[in-house]
Amino acid sequence: MNLKEWLLFSDAVFFAQGTLAWSPSNSYTPANVSCDEDINLIRQASGPSDNETEWLKKRDVYTREALRSFLDRATSNFSDSSLVSQLFSNASDIPRIAVACSGGGYRAMLSGAGMLAAMDNRTDGANEHGLGGLLQSTTYLAGLSGGNWLVGTLAWNNWTSVQDIVNNMTEDDSIWDISNSIINPGGFMIVTTIKRWDHISDAVEGKQDAGFNVSLTDIWGRALSYNFFPSLYRGGVAYTWSTLRDVEVFQNGEMPFPISVADGRYPGTQIIDLNATVFEFNPFEMGSWDPTLNAFTDVKYLGTKVSNGEPVNKGQCVAGYDNTGFIMGTSSSLFNQFLLQINSTSLPSFIKNLVTGFLDDLSEDEDDIAIYAPNPFKDTSYIQDNFSKSISESDYLYLVDGGEDNQNIPLVPLVQDERNVDVIFALDNSADTDYYWPDGASLVSTYERQFSSQGLNMSFPYVPDKRTFVNLGLADKPSFFGCDAQNLTDLNYIPPLVVYIPNARHSYNSNTSTFKLSYTDDERLKMIKNGFEAATRGNLTDDSSFMGCVACAVMRRKQQSLNATLPEECSTCFTNYCWNGTIDDTPVSGLDNSDFDPTAASSAYSAYNTESYSSSSATGSKKNGAGLPATPTSFTSILTLLTAIAGFL
């Protein structure tokens, strides 16, 4: 069944049955459902869930075959490829792969799409000129903010391919049709825009009328969904995150395990720092490995009022709260950054006053971010000793964009020792520099986190400072970190090897603004094409041995644990691609401009609203994902604000 047939079938099932794993209300509004009277929805984060563990057994069947094929092809010119056979002689010695897709708005979604396409054997030319089959060999696929839009789009559209999306780009209701701004989706067709926002308003107001707290992220997530699920009724208004459990391609383990990342915001605060609790959403659960929570809950029953995991009303749960768009919006919600900086922007005064007024009202109720209420972790007993209990004591759970702690690549869920990942491909489409290219800042932040209180139970390989990243060219092309496990023994455990793939110019200036909210068909294709080239060293033209080097990185952890002989070609690869510990901290101008720097956000917002960006633009603003003006708490007045803002976009 192809993508279009599946989408039509899914919509038909939705209207015919209504329930299944979709929202039981057939709408955006959560609803009460029956559940076991003795059910407990929370567990300690002592390892993967039973559901994930059982799923991994199915996935391993597919990755084993795909990885063997990839490694055989990649090492076909090696003088000695016996290591591949040695690894596959025992199931426990087969490497486990993860891919992490960074944030960065549509830039990250499109460039990241090209990078994933380079790893996907369903992409035209990926086997001949790329890393085709690597994605089929991958167990975990994590996304954050714009990277989560990419992961969520592929996973929740029946594991479609980037190639299929590209092939259908000119069709009606095509995925990622962002020719018009998300704020003005109808373009010159004003009626279309008004109708869209009327539907969004109705959906969110329905949730509010049912007694659930709503926030700007509800609106943002609903608006985004029309771009990701255009063939589903009203952008999948009743499509839930847990629906994926019942989709055959996931049930059978034919696709990677998708993970979305968001940050927790402590009650009564606005600033997000490196000690923020990192949350993950997967098809079975949401929660955190961090000691400040150390727990997971069943994502299907979010919205249920609980005490330490037990429903307050025995035998009664809530379902439909885990709307797919809401969770994808949560990972890209940046409204609190504007709350900090809106007054310093150069917006026209009447719009600034309008926006600031709404933001002030929202701030008082802390509705400027994603709010999960009732708190699914209320009274949880799994928080580790000597850590704040503020999350469990609050009636609400507050979540924000997963990169606001400066970890713009979702690495934390993938480096957990219990998941046994051997290598992580870190796709970095951040806008860290003045010219909106990455500079390794995300890797630096995750490395530093392991030495903070939140990093009590994690490890990450050594990486250099940002200046060294730039001075040594580590942010211009793929680089490997943690190549020698013998140098990592002083960490909590041996972490995965990290293959860092940064956004870089090959055939197109892909350093576009995160606030660029519309792309023409041509721009989309060029962004995707450039991403493919960034992941493949220019279609393997810059280095014809790169695929073999990727194979070496994949095998490295298991090769060292077995004390097996390293092919001489791998030694050459590691000399060329592994960071060898050299530091060059010569001052570099234009760094420290993170996607999530609130000061940069204000100037970025101003620039976006006063400049016109063309397809050849090599500049842009530096703020991630959900950089939209605040929306009024009175949903009936939403169009007033949107119409005013649309005139400046």
UniProtKB/Swiss-Prot annotation:
Gene3D superfamilies: Cytosolic phospholipase A2 catalytic domain (3.40.1090.10). It catalyses: a 1-acyl-sn-glycero-3-phosphocholine + H2O = sn-glycerol 3-phosphocholine + a fatty acid + H(+). One of its GO terms (biological process) is glycerophospholipid catabolic process. The keyword Electron transport does not apply. Glycans are attached at residues 32, 51, 77, 90, 121, 158, 168, 213, 275, 343, 386, 457, 487, 511, 539, 563, 580. It holds the Pfam family PLA2_B. Its EC number is 3.1.1.5. InterPro entries: Acyl_Trfase/lysoPLipase, LysoPLipase_cat_dom. One of its GO terms (cellular component) is cytosol. Residues 1-21 form the signal peptide. One of its GO terms (molecular function) is phospholipase A2 activity. It is found in: Secreted. Keywords: Glycoprotein, Hydrolase, Lipid degradation, Lipid metabolism, Secreted, Signal. Its main location: secreted. Residues 34-584 form the PLA2c domain. SMART domains: PLAc. Belongs to the lysophospholipase family. Catalyzes the release of fatty acids from lysophospholipids. This is Lysophospholipase.
